[in-house]
Amino acid sequence: MNDQLQYDYIVEKLASAGQVFEICSKIKDFEQLAQVIEKDLAALDPKEFPSMWKESEIIGEIKFDLAGTEECFPIMIGDFTANIFAVCQRCLDLMEIKVQVKPKVALMELGQSMDNFDEFEIWELSESTLKPHEVIEELLIMALPLSVMHNDKGKCKASLAYLNNEKKQDLVRPFANLRSQLKKNK
């Protein structure tokens, strides 16, 4: 893990220096993220549990800068990706997802406001310092899908089983003749 991500930095100094941090870490370096992933993987049969899931890489960068013309304020932009093991909520099988985060964050002091910068998400900071490691971890946790499912239904055992069953049996439609029955009764 990059040790430089662990240090406390003054936000204004990061922004005025245009500081860039390269991210080349692993899931195991982010304790809270690892806990969230581990809870999801707990649904798997112990035989299917991936042994090296904590070794999945997180790669990218974040950059601090100043935005605004009259009253400058610190911003953080970036692009980083994590490959994460998860459990499909349809078929309960192991799958790997790619979580890409492209933050555009304005780092404001509590109560501070800004106008005409709608492209930035506002984060109010209670302190003038931050640890890039914590910011990256929080962004990754927020980017995790609430319900993980195979994008390709052809890879999902539950979808395949449903499609196969649907082809094999005629669906019973209990209300198919209801309209004609109602007309007869009138």
Which residues are covered by each model-predicted region?
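Structured interface patches
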Residues: M1-K186
